[in-house]
Regions:
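Catalytic core of tubulin tyrosine ligase-like
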Residues: 34, 145, 159
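Active-site "cap" helix and flanking loop/linker of ATP-utilizing ligase/carboxylase catalytic domains
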Residues: 115-137, 154-195
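Phosphate-binding site of ATP-dependent enzymes
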Residues: 37-87, 132, 136-149, 188-195
Length: 195
């Protein structure tokens, strides 16, 4: 199946929890086949790789947008993490090699778009499906020429991102967490130093 696609135009993803190591950007048809064999037959990711997704590869800069989701949305300062090992992003994905915040590739206009178009709609859709989510939502976003695109959602903060974002909070963390759970969150309860 995977041989029908140009390997430089796809991403192969494990369909389970792979601790940041379940995404491969193949460079050749052989590399694509080996990735699928590695995940599904050799069980390199155990249960996480029993099923795989083959998706269109997006080009652009990645940004990690983490929010407290409740009755309102409280955004942490956006960050950028580096997942690939080795210089020049030449190696496999990892749980995170490092990162920085704030993410200077993200304009205020684009952040508003992510907030209003992606996060608010996700919040509305979850409530409409009877899944009113309260907690931390991690949105892995690719900033493409066509606008921001969601790569993934996680219901946790990323580790490199948390190390960058939590020290930048200028409001206390515990009241924001409690308000998130009680659905009394005010976005001003999650303010960060954006310098």
């Amino acid at each position: 199946y995977v041989s029908k696609y140009d390997p430089t135009k796809i991403v192969i993803k494990a369909d389970g929890q792979a601790l940041g190591k379940g995404v491969v950007l193949p460079r050749s048809p052989e590399g694509a086949r080996e990735t699928i064999l590695d995940f599904m037959v050799r069980k390199s990711l155990r249960e996480a790789g029993e099923r795989v997704l083959i998706q269109k590869r997006l080009e652009g800069q990645e940004v990690s947008v983490i929010a407290f989701m409740s009755n309102q949305i409280g955004l942490l300062v956006p960050a950028r993490d580096y997942k690939r090992a080795y210089d020049g992003d030449a190696g496999p994905n990892t749980g995170g090699m490092g990162g920085y915040a704030p993410n200077e590739n993200l304009s205020r206009e684009t952040l508003y778009r992510i907030h209003d178009v992606i996060l608010r709609r996700t919040q509305f859709a979850m409530r409409s499906e009877g899944i009113p989510y309260r907690g931390v939502l991690y949105a892995g976003i690719m900033l493409t020429d066509e606008g921001p695109k969601v790569l993934e959602f996680n219901v946790r903060r990323g580790d490199p991102e948390a190390q960058l974002q939590l020290p930048r909070l200028i409001t206390p963390l515990l009241p924001a967490m409690e308000a998130t759970m009680r659905e009394t969150l005010d976005p001003d309860m999650v303010r960060s130093d954006s310098r």
